[in-house]
Amino acid sequence: MLSFFKKKIVVPHVRLTGVIGAAGRFKQGMDLAGQRAILKKAFSFKKIKHVAISINSPGGSPVQSHLIYSYIKQLAKEKKVKVIIFAEDVAASGGYLISCAGDEIYANSSSIIGSIGVISASFGFKDLIKKIGIERRVYTAGKNKSTLDPFVDEKEEDVKRLKSIQLELHADFIKVVETSRGSKLKEPEKNNIFTGEFWTGSAALKLGLVDGVGNADQVLKEKFGDKVIIKN
């Protein structure tokens, strides 16, 4: 017997927004602990073939970025589901790392995409505390316990140690991007893709950092038809 009813396609849609980092009672942040339940729910729908995830994040903690990325990959593998990522205002640094969990990445033409690098920033207060007459006392067990102390002169060995950690984290980030994007990337060295530079969505498309330009509703309807059910 022929069916006169076309099977409806359902695509769960999750939104991940904010600076990436551990959240607390008085601190907002996007971390795996806060996103685990909504991600698990999205992948738990029966008979789905795709999950859509919109990302709006400038980055943050490399650890939480990687944890969220890995959890999305894990769920996709377990449920045999494809992941479609949609970058909104920004998917940069850790936000882009999470985007790499997608089988496809889309962005708005004006989205900010990339910033594949690592940054650390601080201030030096040595002259300030001297000027206002504050005497600082520090007691440690372990000669490197006060590494990068902002109240004393910067030490060359401290900076060197920090740089080595940054390079290690950067290498891990690059590996994730290369694994995700592969041959889609257009001449990474020539185009400074791994230098921390960032681009608009339109420029990112030309570099192979995203697969297309468009928003979730538009792209999902183009892919699955006007009657696709997007479960937000």
List each model region and its residues.
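Short glycine/proline-centered loop/turn elements that form peptide/ligand docking sites
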Residues: 112
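N-terminal organellar transit peptides
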Residues: 1-108, 119-232
